Amino acid sequence: MLRSLFRRLFKYLLWFMAASVVLVAVLRWVPPPGTMVMVERKVGSWVDGQPIDLQRDWRSWEQLPDSLKVAVIAGEDQHFAEHHGFDLPAIQQALAHNERGGSIRGASTLSQQVAKNVFLWSGRSWLRKGLEAWFTLLIETLWTKQRILEVYLNSAEWGPGVFGAQAAARYHFGLDAERLSRTQASQLAAVLPSPLKWSAARPGPYVRQRAAWIRQQMWQLGGDDYLLRLER
């Protein structure tokens, strides 16, 4: 009986792996219709009795401003072009920082953030961590770096019910994403760690300081030329 149970579980695991490979392969070419974070926000608003309308307007890689692409890389994942989904030195630094106490520092790459935002629910269980690693490996294998960043910029949360660069540009600055200035792009990147708490349009001292640091990092990374490294 135990052997039969293991055989059945193994079969389900194979089916899940095959289905997830097909899903990720399809989404290399087809824009994701939504994300798990969007579902959670919508359901949560219903439960709270304050339903919200989700704002999202997909923009292709060519329509997204280079300044925002580089700003997000500078603020979130400066080794994006080099790693294969996991930034091991950053993970080690985060673990050392957290062991010393103080605020908890994360080390999620853009690839990991796409995996958990698009495919997974919120939480910190070992099951979710395992699934996050699996989907990260899949998108790093089946998608290009440009596609990963494109999906990230169209799926990131930038305010209450605001998802993606186009909706963020309209919500915070009243203009289309392709018209964002370098300063505005850095401010959008600066609020990504806590988009429901911080405002890109009305930045406080910390967000202004972080945005200035991001602009400096953009220059050190080589500016828009950094994006050429994503074509390799």
UniProtKB/Swiss-Prot annotation:
GO terms for biological process: cell wall organization; peptidoglycan biosynthetic process; regulation of cell shape. Keywords: Cell inner membrane, Cell membrane, Cell shape, Cell wall biogenesis/degradation, Glycosyltransferase, Membrane, Peptidoglycan synthesis, Transferase, Transmembrane, Transmembrane helix. It comes from the Bacteria. The gene is mtgA. GO terms for molecular function: pentosyltransferase activity; peptidoglycan glycosyltransferase activity. It holds the Pfam family Transgly. It catalyses: [GlcNAc-(1->4)-Mur2Ac(oyl-L-Ala-gamma-D-Glu-L-Lys-D-Ala-D-Ala)](n)-di-trans,octa-cis-undecaprenyl diphosphate + beta-D-GlcNAc-(1->4)-Mur2Ac(oyl-L-Ala-gamma-D-Glu-L-Lys-D-Ala-D-Ala)-di-trans,octa-cis-undecaprenyl diphosphate = [GlcNAc-(1->4)-Mur2Ac(oyl-L-Ala-gamma-D-Glu-L-Lys-D-Ala-D-Ala)](n+1)-di-trans,octa-cis-undecaprenyl diphosphate + di-trans,octa-cis-undecaprenyl diphosphate + H(+). The lineage of its organism: Bacteria, Pseudomonadati, Pseudomonadota, Gammaproteobacteria, Pseudomonadales. It is a single-pass membrane protein. It comes from Pseudomonas aeruginosa (strain ATCC 15692 / DSM 22644 / CIP 104116 / JCM 14847 / LMG 12228 / 1C / PRS 101 / PAO1). GO terms for cellular component: peptidoglycan-based cell wall; plasma membrane. NCBIfam families: mono_pep_trsgly. Its main location: membrane. It is found in: Cell inner membrane. Peptidoglycan polymerase that catalyzes glycan chain elongation from lipid-linked precursors. HAMAP family: PGT_MtgA. This is Biosynthetic peptidoglycan transglycosylase. Pathway: Cell wall biogenesis; peptidoglycan biosynthesis. Its EC number is 2.4.99.28. Belongs to the glycosyltransferase 51 family. The chain crosses the membrane at residues 12-31.
